[in-house]
Amino acid sequence: MLGVTYSIADQNVATTKSIGIYNLSTSLAQTLSEQPQLERLTILSNKTVSSDLTLTAKARVEECNYPILSRWGRIWWDQWGVYQRARAERNPWLFLPKGFCSFVARPPVKVAAYVHDIMGNFYSRRYPSYIPKLESHYFAKSLRATVCRSSVIFTNSNFSRSELLDFARQTGLKEPKVIVAGFGFRPIKEKPGEKQNRVLLFVNKAPHKLTSLAVSFLTRWLRESNFNGVIDCLGTVSPATQNPTGPQWNWLGRVALGQSRELIRRARAVVYSSEYEGFGIPPVEAVLEGTCPVFSDIPALCETMGETGCPFSNDSESSFLAAMNRALSMAPATLQEWSESLLQRHTWAAVSKRIVDELLVQEGLQIIK
């Protein structure tokens, strides 16, 4: 019998640093509950998450609220609490959708971890002073524990898989079992709305998001193009950042999820810059909302998007200008074709099936096609 304890008790949509990880955690819980060969599924949830879960009857929800009440509660959960609950549930597997094992205790059951990226390792090399030393040390030890103590690791992309394997080799750890499960999206029920003469720029205070570079590129594009609309800047930036002012720049800060979707839908193009990602969700969401994305041509984003969207080189202002001009002239029919292609490639049903199939293999059980 295949049984899984699934931990989402340490997540809170109001405080999460990654809405993508939160969406994966809730969506995957739902589609795992729909997998016929997963016979037992216990969801360790909390009062902020349970209302976002749509589960089949086989799933049993147990609320554990202390991990979201304080930092110490979260640390206790990470290092001891989740293992205590996994032992009590007596399922053979514990699934960690945030991807971090305890580095203090050994798991009482087999662990399957979903690792989204190794951003902390990237920052330790590229921006070593950005993350506080204690926090950086904590997550570095958690990543090592995940590589060493997981029976299997799932990732969102081939790029993330290669990063994990490289990390294991470079640190002298035993090569882990890493399976690309992928990431999923659902069709947008509403038809694309009427476009306004606006461009949406995702901004972020994290240095790997290259906000200053994107603003610089857009400033030149505004100067050289005949675009007379508005640049909506979605997200938070460092207080020390010198933001452009004037009627064409609209700095919004952080907004609710529903409002961000509307901002994407009304824009003629979405700009997403980055130098490191494990997958890259916003460009896909832009296409699904009927808007052309302009995005950095880094490995993970190119893998995720395939032949869709308008990529540009972070090292080339001219490639950005060309990508913007292509995006604003993109035909709605092309965007519809891209949307259908991306939905075929990235489905939650396929993600959960890959995960369950691998757990069945690990258990020596037969996979039913």
Feature roles, as predicted:
Residues M1-K369:
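Carbohydrate transferase catalytic cores enriched for Leloir-type hexosyltransferases
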